[in-house]
UniProtKB/Swiss-Prot annotation:
Organism phylogeny: Bacteria, Pseudomonadati, Pseudomonadota, Gammaproteobacteria, Moraxellales
Pathway: Glycolipid biosynthesis; lipid IV(A) biosynthesis; lipid IV(A) from (3R)-3-hydroxytetradecanoyl-[acyl-carrier-protein] and UDP-N-acetyl-alpha-D-glucosamine: step 2/6
The UniProt record lists the keyword Lipid biosynthesis: yes
InterPro entries: Ribosomal_Su5_D2-typ_SF (IPR020568), UDP-acyl_GlcNac_deAcase (IPR004463), UDP-acyl_GlcNac_deAcase_C (IPR011334), UDP-acyl_N-AcGlcN_deAcase_N (IPR015870)
Function, as annotated: Catalyzes the hydrolysis of UDP-3-O-myristoyl-N-acetylglucosamine to form UDP-3-O-myristoylglucosamine and acetate, the committed step in lipid A biosynthesis.
Native organism: Acinetobacter baumannii (strain ATCC 17978 / DSM 105126 / CIP 53.77 / LMG 1025 / NCDC KC755 / 5377)
Protein's name according to its UniProt entry: UDP-3-O-acyl-N-acetylglucosamine deacetylase
Listed GO MF terms: metal ion binding; UDP-3-O-acyl-N-acetylglucosamine deacetylase activity
Length: 300
């Protein structure tokens, strides 16, 4: 049987909030069977739990934010992506502020931290969401589409007319597994244009942004001295974001995802469109690991 997963032990770390610029503590706590992914604001008294649920995404400008009432946990997509990449079903993510720390702008540091906690199988079947028919979300010329597929394949295309974005590196395809995610996706960093930074900071956004946690792009190219980690790092990061955004459906998805210029808001709309019609999907489990179309890292 393919079983649910959590961590063996608590892992604690800290980092800088991308938008607040403040130090943020983050703790990963093992969670119970069918508990799902839950974000907990421990800076509040009493602490407030917000489940990682697509229907609780109320803001999606530049990042995915979970909101319940007037309580928010922002910039969750990179840690959600790491959680999805390792096949973790149940986890409490404690944060000491209204956003998850940005770390180096990728999911790599979160993969490292979660692996320090050790993966632990739980005595319950892992649930998957199998897409049964095409579902799409469209905004202007942007597209996000699910279609039936025996696995989880992500195809993404960006479209930037800019010297830093070579045409041959604006599309990528990943057949999702723990191995492909960790080695081909997780280290891809977020990126932004230097010309936008002053505007963002004037609006109390990106106060923690630096070349240590993002790829900076000016009018001619990449500003970071070390350059890119991959020739197609920009589109790989969009796939990283999509993996995290789509895991907000509550379980690993079995489908093909096609994204064209899609972002957090459109990814979220796609999930809402899936949920709007129960005939779009079914919940499946696998009694035999050989039947599972998505390869995960072994739990030892």
């Amino acid at each position: 049987m393919v079983k649910q997963r959590t961590l063996n032990r608590v892992v604690k770390a800290s980092g800088i909030g991308l938008h607040s610029g403040q130090k943020v503590m983050i703790n990963f706590i093992p969670h119970t069977v069918d508990g799902g992914i839950v974000f907990r604001r421990i800076d509040l008294d009493p602490p407030v739990d917000i489940p990682a649920n697509a229907l609780l995404i109320q803001e999606a400008f530049m990042c995915s934010n979970l909101v319940t009432g007037d309580i928010k946990v922002g910039t969750i997509e990179h840690v959600m992506s790491a959680i999805a990449g390792l096949g973790i079903d149940n986890l409490i993510v404690e944060v000491s502020a209204s956003e998850v720390p940005i770390m180096d702008g990728s999911a790599g540091p979160f993969i490292y931290l979660l692996m320090q906690g050790g993966l632990c199988e739980q005595d319950a079947p892992k649930k998957f969401i199998k897409i049964l028919k095409p579902v799409e979300a469209l905004i202007d010329d942007k597209k996000a589409i699910f279609s039936p597929h025996n696995g989880f394949q992500l195809n993404f295309t960006i479209d930037f007319d800019h010297p830093a974005f070579a045409k041959e590196y604006q599309s990528a395809t990943i057949d999702f597994s723990t191995e492909t995610f960790v080695y081909e996706v997780s280290e891809a960093r977020t990126f932004g244009f230097m010309k936008d930074l002053d505007y963002l900071k004037a609006n109390n956004l990106a106060l923690g942004a630096s070349l240590d946690n993002a790829i900076g792009v000016d009018d001619t190219g990449v500003v970071n001295e070390e350059g890119l980690r991959f020739a197609d790092e920009f589109v790989r990061h969009k796939i990283l974001d999509a993996v995290g955004d789509l895991y907000l459906l509550g379980h690993q998805i079995i489908a093909k995802f096609d994204g064209y210029k899609s972002g957090h808001a459109l990814n979220n709309q796609l999930l809402r469109n899936v949920q709007s019609d129960p005939s779009n999907y079914e919940i499946v489990t696998f009694n035999d690991e050989k039947d599972c179309p998505i390869p995960y890292v072994s739990v030892t």
